């Protein structure tokens, strides 16, 4: 199957997708009523899109193309208001977090959608297990070769993005001992982790053609790499973040990725090489397991660095780009987060350690998303 030409888009424009949990009080288990909610809110939207994801307990909020994080925040805030109002009318709750802490995957109903039903046929129970919730950020690129360079550059910072956004310590009623357990769900998928090595857009088109021979790949949407190019949108999409508990944190993560993209494409600090990925999965694992306390290893020198320290270095590097893009508030907020030494996974564990229950934790997450 041939790949679409790369659609030229304005560099550094943004798109944000948030996969939200639809909750059923008073049990605070996942609901299976996302279709009802989506039908109720669609006529009220003035910008962005609200749509299904894999199962009936998931709802996706997606912005349109945005110039900067302020425009993205305005669109997401408007969608948030509409969704919360409809959820209240239908006696449902909405919250973030990368996993629901005690849902059972066997109870999850795959959406009655041709693509998702085909995916269920291909992957079986793995699709129901993939009832997890992530944030995806698209960044515009001028051409396909820039997109491939940007993808490789951003891959250096996958552990940093994971550690900052980690919000999935609990699954199936248990503490997983991971800061981000969500990404482990995808380890059984054949397209898990980094994209196979290519050096330019022409090589990527050849890779996609060969992948399509498997009959499991019909479009870019069928590839679940940590970062992927999207020729139809003219973007590179970063997919490793847990859905945050607050809209503010989602915006901050998007601002970091936008600023990092600007720094990478203007400064070109790396010459991408296949060997860059030798320790990719080890460093990714450190971020998932330990969050900002993880230790990453340089594939060339063997140097080992705390993720917290290396994240501060990244934030310093991208600060000039953030100022140009109007994203400096995001960088400042994330810098403060790192210096305080925490992420949302840590907050969740503290809630339980203080005597809270997993049901109470989900209730609290719904209150946080509603601004209570």
UniProtKB/Swiss-Prot annotation:
Cystine residue pairs: none
Gene Ontology MF terms: ATP binding; glutamate-cysteine ligase activity
Gene3D superfamilies: 3.30.590.20
Swiss-Prot/TrEMBL keywords: ATP-binding, Ligase, Nucleotide-binding
Record-listed E.C. numbers: 6.3.2.2
Pfam family, one: GCS2
Broad enzyme group: ligase
Reactions this protein catalyses: L-cysteine + L-glutamate + ATP = gamma-L-glutamyl-L-cysteine + ADP + phosphate + H(+)
Top-rank lineage group of the source organism: Bacteria
Function recorded in the entry: ATP-dependent carboxylate-amine ligase which exhibits weak glutamate--cysteine ligase activity.
Listed NCBIfam families: gshA_cyan_rel (TIGR02050), PRK13516.1 (NF010040)
Name of the protein in question: Putative glutamate--cysteine ligase 2
Organism (species): Salmonella gallinarum (strain 287/91 / NCTC 13346)
Gene name of the record: ybdK
